[in-house]
A protein has these predicted regions:
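N-terminal auxiliary "cap/dimerization" subdomain that precedes the catalytic jelly-roll/cupin core
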Residues: 1-66, 71, 75-82
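Catalytic micro-motifs at enzyme active sites that drive phosphoryl/nucleotidyl and oxygen chemistry
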Residues: 11-12, 108-112, 183
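Short, surface-exposed beta-edge/turn micro-motifs
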Residues: 19-22, 118-121, 165, 192-193
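A structural signal for short, well-ordered beta-strand segments and their strand-loop junctions
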Residues: 23-26, 96-102, 123, 169-170, ...
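Short helix/loop capping segments that flank catalytic or ligand/cofactor-binding pockets
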Residues: 33-34, 132-134, 171, 178-179
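Extracellular-facing segments of soluble proteins and assemblies that are Gly/Ser/Thr-biased and enriched
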Residues: 67-106, 110-114
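Catalytic core of non-heme Fe(II) oxygenases with the double-stranded beta-helix
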Residues: 106-166
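Catalytic core of Fe(II)/2-oxoglutarate
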Residues: 152-202
Length: 202
């Protein structure tokens, strides 16, 4: 299994390949998006937004974020959400996507795990990026113990991090046969984070 990292949202379509487990993209306006996210993190300390987006409600999506965040420049985040949602529809044939934007002050998922869904977008807009382990470097015996103090790594392997502002599409456990899903967890610190997740929903 391998990971692909690029700067175009079209790269996400590589996830259809059996040998690809994750695709990460740092978009052209990522610095502007991070700056926007810093404002959100500063102004909204206990944020937990959720929106079900059925692809034909772009204005409703923008209005929801604008009202919820009390900010005018939400297109910086809603425009890329619309783009990647269309890619999810193409990859999974889903009818809509579920969007969550959450502020965190402690690890939401402290134990390495996989998501039992076809795939998931994870974007750390502010703070440390999600930690993950390439499939071929996972020690599955340790993984099955589910101990937060034991990293399920093979010898000489290292935990990897998605970059802040990077849009990452991870295969889940129900994507294809003979693949358990991308092993990942929240970073182990109490640093404030702003996390965006987007899931296909049938």
């Amino acid at each position: 299994m391998k990971a692909i990292f690029g700067n175009s949202f079209y790269d996400f379509e590589y996830l259809i390949l059996k040998q690809v487990e994750v695709v990460g993209v740092l978009p052209e306006k990522f610095e502007e998006i991070i700056s926007f996210a810093k404002k959100v993190a500063k102004n909204k300390k206990n944020l937990e937004l959720e929106f079900s987006y059925p692809f034909n409600q772009d204005k409703e999506l923008e209005s929801f974020f604008s009202k919820s965040l009390d900010m005018n420049d939400v297109a910086l985040i809603t425009n890329p959400i619309v783009e990647v949602s269309k890619i999810l529809r193409k990859l999974t044939k889903c009818k809509k996507v579920n969007i969550k934007l959450t502020s965190l002050r402690s690890p939401m998922c402290p134990i390495f795990h996989v998501d039992n869904i076809p795939c998931r977008f994870l974007v750390t807009l502010y703070g440390s990026g999600t930690e993950w382990i390439p499939h071929d470097e996972v020690d599955w015996k340790i993984f099955d113990i589910k101990d937060a103090n034991k990293n399920p790594l093979k010898d000489r392997s290292k935990i990897k991090n998605f970059r802040t502002g990077e849009w990452s599409l991870l295969k889940g456990g129900s994507w294809q046969e003979n693949f358990n899903g991308v092993v990942h967890r929240s970073p182990h610190n109490n640093e404030e984070r702003l996390l965006l997740s987007i899931d296909p929903y049938s």
